[in-house]
Amino acid sequence: MGVVHDVWVVTKQLLEATALPWPAEERETWLSQVDELLRRRERLLHKLRPPYSEEEQRLGREIVAWNQEIEARLRQVRDEIRDDLRMAGAKRQANAHYVHPYEQPLSFDGMFYDKRR
């Protein structure tokens, strides 16, 4: 039961690491920890070889169920990061309008269109 149990242990650590709320200030630390756990689990998954005992099959079903929870949490973190990047871009653009107000027009509402030309 060695390799399957090791995969189960690493997956459980990964589940615990992704289940906690990640403050934005500590996100980089959490991401590096999750990345290391994913790399360790990947190395162990390459060592898995059948046949599996009943206990190993039970652990495997548990691993699959946990993996779905882990994927859902990582998708949520990805969306949070995407939103933060989008907000940072919007703030940067708004700041650029304040620094250089006449460089780009904010709107074209007051434009005059000459039909003759």
UniProtKB/Swiss-Prot annotation:
State the compartments where it is located. Answer: Cytoplasm, Cytosol
List the residue ranges forming a coiled coil, or say none: 24-88
Does the keyword Ligase feature in the UniProt annotation? no
Highest taxon of source = Bacteria
A GO BP term, please? bacterial-type flagellum organization
Disulphide bridges, residue numbers: none
> Keywords in UniProt for this one?
Bacterial flagellum biogenesis, Chaperone, Coiled coil, Cytoplasm
Q: Name one GO cellular component term.
A: cytosol
Give the UniProt family note: Belongs to the bacillales FliT family.
Can you state the subunit structure given in the record? Homodimer.
Functionally, this protein is described as follows: May act as an export chaperone for the filament capping protein FliD.
Q: What is this protein called?
A: Flagellar protein FliT
Origin organism is: Geobacillus thermodenitrificans (strain NG80-2)
